[in-house]
Amino acid sequence: MTLASPLPLHTPADTKRVSALTYAVASAMRRHNAPSLGAVDQAWLEGRPQTLLSLLDTTVAASAAEPRDEELVAACLWLLANQLELIRYKLERDYDWASVVLDAYQENLIVLARAQTLRSEDWFALVNLLNVAKVPIRPEMSEALAKAALDATPPGEALSPQGIPAEVSRAVDELGRSAKDPFRVVEELADIGMLMPVELRAFITHELGLPSHAVLREAVPLLLLDPEPVVRRSAAAVLEQIASPQTFSPVMLRRALLLRNWIPEEERAAIDRLVRKARVKGVECAQWAPASALSIQCTIVDGSGAQSVVLTTPTGRIGLFAGLLLKQGFGVRDAWCDLSVPRREITRSLKEARCEMAWRMTGRDHLNTVVQHHIARGLALGNLPQLQLLEIAEAIGAADWKDRSLDMTAETEQLLAGSCAAATSPAQIALSLRRSGEWIDRDPMVQSWFEDGAAVRALVDKRPRLKPDVALRRVLEEVLPARRDAWAERLVLLALWLRDSTEDALPAELSQDCLVLARELRAGRPPAELPAMVAIAERSVFVARVHAQ
């Protein structure tokens, strides 16, 4: 399989090392029942994104081998999912090659389907990795993959009398008989319907509300968070149709009420109608469980605008272990929730995480503020929260999470007004700006604070190559002014993180300095006059030059 991109092609040496890695991961799975990869190997994979296609070749070979080594196949799929996710991160930072590599992966899937060299379940597993890694699929690529899936379907499996593929109809019926949890139903439906036309998915959504399987009906409110508007509208329509005590449970009503505030404004009237009908018909709303004790740990906002939150129950042999990835420019990027994790696993995972990033304990007020802010920012960009956010909200009693975006200007002034000694005079402001510049330049906690977008890379890659001082000046004059609001938001989120930390306090002036810098940025002060932005620009040029080598 080949790759047309600015990246080097994957070499025989890459293929050999990839093969060795898959066997190492398979061996770890046999010993510990869990995949793992050493830091050196992980770094090598990150530095060789073109090995995605070597991994795909290796996975295909392992899947088709006789006898088949299931651990080896599982190891290949795990590595593929990891590599797809790493490349998706680069795609989000506007690396042109990332789109080329991900398209090449999908094009090779189409070739595999046409050649029919794999069992259909193995091919669908490779396709589903795109869903696992949250890789966006272009509409034309989705259409091509769907056609490839149809071509690979045996002739007798085409359509049921209702127009649903027979295999899908059987899978949905099996879900109704075996599933106990509506959240798992939706996850399984996402896997089944990934390559379906959206109109067919909407039809299936409507049908879920009608059968005798209660768990399928319970899943319909969760589809109000589906990425596709037509599926969400279908879910709202069938819920209104079945809104009576016999078919619409109190939990379904509670979930519909919460999710109303997580979907676009223009879709909320349909939720209001079904809620009114349910109440008129006598459906009672399920009560929320009392908020339990909660340990909340939160990272600093990194240079990509990402902030991770981990939630655990502080006592007991087993407990809640949940997490969120909040992302500037996206919203709630990821969420996961497990209600019963052994305490030793929670402790080990938290210890490992703290070795990699700056974490601090925060409280519920901070959690509520940042989650609701990112729900709102995500909605403004057309990105609905993941379904697992609902699981988390129900687990911790977050009954009031809505789309509440922070007004960054007002928040900055409010936080500054509450500080002990707000910088107001020109001399105080200059001192504060100098301190923030020194901190951002030297503190390892913010070493990821730099620009890594296409604009910086274009300057660094320019031929003839710009002198360092010229590149720095152009980043300050051409790149950072367009990013001032993003950096101001990042600084306010950092100030909130510092204010609400329940651990030992960092220097008292640090939060104030962040807010002063945010205020100056939003006021339009040139980045070249702000020592912190000069430090960010210098680091941006340095990192871009390193990556260009």
Locations of the language-model features?
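Non-catalytic terminal/accessory regions
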Residues: 1-222, 229-234, 238-244, 249, ...
